[in-house]
């Protein structure tokens, strides 16, 4: 009888372990060990100042939500509020850069904002409020989104409402600078429920993506001039590289039900064609000519997983990611991999409304 009981206990323990194993996201667990402090600070160790950015904090919040990791989410949120927002994301946009100063003090290094981190943070808070049924997250997310609209959205003659990359330094009297990778179309769709300026920002953001890629490659940065439009043949060559790689990934993550997805995929098809032909995405591309150079790092291959529509080409990039998985000193490659590979593994999807569809599963929900 004791043997039977012992065997039953062992089976139950193994079953519980297998459920827990099925619920965990190994790449996320490793990322936490390698890149997130116990206090909730996402660290980029490649910089000697051991920097933290609002982008990194916002991505950490998204991954924690996708993984149903509320403890990590709270840690990251608390650190962000206390160190980047002087205690409250309701009261101010987070500073974009924090790290070690020359005098060895740890503090904000640049108090300007970065709207890519801000929109991901607001969206993650709003979705955390919905999925975890926690009003506090919803309240902070709503206040943050209103502040983004007030401080980072401008009206551009000939375009309409546009999201600046930050609140300072990107707008002159007749010229504005934009980063096409800062507002994913899915998030732009989600924010339309909150009314102006988001209802029109979705369309102007689509124009930014579609009109600045004449050869099918999105620029990292682009300038718009009043009465002259997009400056695609500027004195300085426009490059598609480490920022723009996210554009293709965001487009690939759009739900198939979104009527704009096919149009976006068609616009950026040259990027898919190059990757399929060469077995890797390019590191840099001249936006005006379409001339590519260099082999993109492993994070670029991960970013291609949602974007590529050819299954054989997808498999090549999937294998490249598996064979060259980022280590503990490759923050940006790792976050691209969590996004791209995580999507490829069906750990999350987005609805037509831009809401998160996490793969928590009933067993996972019951095991927490």
From Swiss-Prot:
It is an enzyme of class 3 (hydrolase). It holds the Pfam family Glyco_hydro_8. The keyword Transferase does not apply. The active site is at 55 (proton donor), 116 (nucleophile). GO terms for molecular function: cellulase activity. It catalyses: Endohydrolysis of (1->4)-beta-D-glucosidic linkages in cellulose, lichenin and cereal beta-D-glucans. It is found in: Secreted. One of its GO terms (biological process) is cellulose catabolic process. Residues 1-21 form the signal peptide. Transmembrane segments: none annotated. The keyword Hydrolase applies. One of its GO terms (cellular component) is extracellular region. Its main location: secreted. Keywords: Carbohydrate metabolism, Cellulose degradation, Glycosidase, Hydrolase, Polysaccharide degradation, Secreted, Signal. Pathway: Glycan metabolism; bacterial cellulose biosynthesis. Its EC number is 3.2.1.4. NCBIfam families: PRK11097.1. Hydrolyzes carboxymethylcellulose. Belongs to the glycosyl hydrolase 8 (cellulase D) family. This is Endoglucanase. It comes from Escherichia coli O157:H7.
């Amino acid at each position: 009888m004791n043997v039977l009981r012992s065997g039953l206990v062992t089976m139950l323990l193994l079953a519980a372990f297998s459920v827990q194993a099925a619920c965990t996201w190994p790449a996320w667990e490793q990322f936490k060990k390698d890149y997130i402090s116990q206090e909730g600070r996402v660290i980029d160790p490649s910089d000697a100042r051991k920097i933290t950015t609002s982008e990194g904090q916002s991505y950490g919040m998204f991954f924690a939500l996708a993984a149903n990791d509320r403890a990590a989410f709270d840690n990251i949120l608390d650190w962000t509020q206390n160190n980047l927002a002087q205690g409250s994301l309701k009261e101010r946009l987070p500073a974009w850069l924090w790290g070690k100063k020359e005098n060895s003090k740890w503090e904000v290094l640049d108090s300007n904002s970065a709207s890519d981190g801000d929109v991901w943070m607001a969206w993650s808070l709003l979705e955390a409020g919905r999925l975890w049924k926690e009003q506090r997250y919803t309240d902070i997310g709503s206040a943050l989104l209103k502040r983004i609209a007030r401080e980072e959205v401008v009206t551009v003659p000939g375009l309409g409402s546009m999201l600046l990359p930050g609140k300072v330094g990107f707008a002159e009297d007749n010229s504005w600078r934009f980063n096409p990778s800062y507002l994913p179309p899915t998030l732009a769709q989600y924010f339309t429920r909150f009314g102006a300026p988001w209802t029109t920002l979705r369309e102007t953001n689509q124009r930014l993506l579609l009109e600045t890629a004449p050869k099918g490659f999105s620029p990292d940065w682009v300038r718009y001039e009043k009465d002259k439009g997009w400056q695609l043949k500027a004195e300085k060559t426009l490059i598609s590289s480490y920022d723009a790689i996210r554009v293709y990934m965001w487009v690939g993550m759009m739900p198939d039900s979104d009527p704009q997805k096919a149009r976006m995929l068609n616009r950026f098809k040259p990027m898919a064609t190059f990757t399929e032909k060469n077995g890797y995405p390019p590191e840099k591309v001249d936006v005006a000519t379409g001339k590519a150079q260099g082999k993109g790092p492993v994070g670029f291959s991960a970013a291609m997983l949602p974007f590529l529509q050819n299954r054989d080409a997808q498999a090549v990039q999937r294998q490249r990611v598996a064979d060259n998985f980022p280590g503990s000193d490759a923050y940006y490659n790792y976050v691209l991999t969590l996004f791209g590979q995580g999507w490829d593994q069906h750990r999350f999807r987005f609805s037509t409304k831009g809401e998160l569809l996490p793969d928590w599963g009933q067993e996972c929900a019951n095991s927490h």
